[in-house]
């Protein structure tokens, strides 16, 4: 599943512009007692890095 997430392109919006990017890194964030989410780190063409939730996990 991890390879599937990293090889797919996602639409990322930053400062009003939309980019189709592949994540550099992805991880699961799941606080105790709450449903988890998959967060991904994207590198923009201008050199900045942003994080975005790309998937919600079932409870």
Swiss-Prot record:
Transmembrane segments: none annotated. The keyword Membrane does not apply. Its main location: cytoplasm. One of its GO terms (molecular function) is double-stranded DNA binding. GO terms for cellular component: chromosome; cytoplasm. InterPro entries: Cren7_sf, dsDNA-bd_Cren7. HAMAP family: Chromatin_Cren7. Belongs to the Cren7 family. This is Chromatin protein Cren7. It comes from Pyrobaculum aerophilum (strain ATCC 51768 / DSM 7523 / JCM 9630 / CIP 104966 / NBRC 100827 / IM2). The lineage of its organism: Archaea, Thermoproteota, Thermoprotei, Thermoproteales, Thermoproteaceae.
């Amino acid at each position: 599943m991890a390879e599937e997430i990293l090889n797919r392109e996602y639409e990322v919006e930053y400062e009003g512009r939309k980019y189709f990017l592949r994540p550099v890194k992805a991880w699961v964030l799941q606080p105790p007692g709450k449903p988890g989410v998959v967060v991904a780190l994207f590198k923009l063409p201008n050199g900045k890095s942003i994080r975005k939730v790309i998937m919600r996990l079932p409870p």
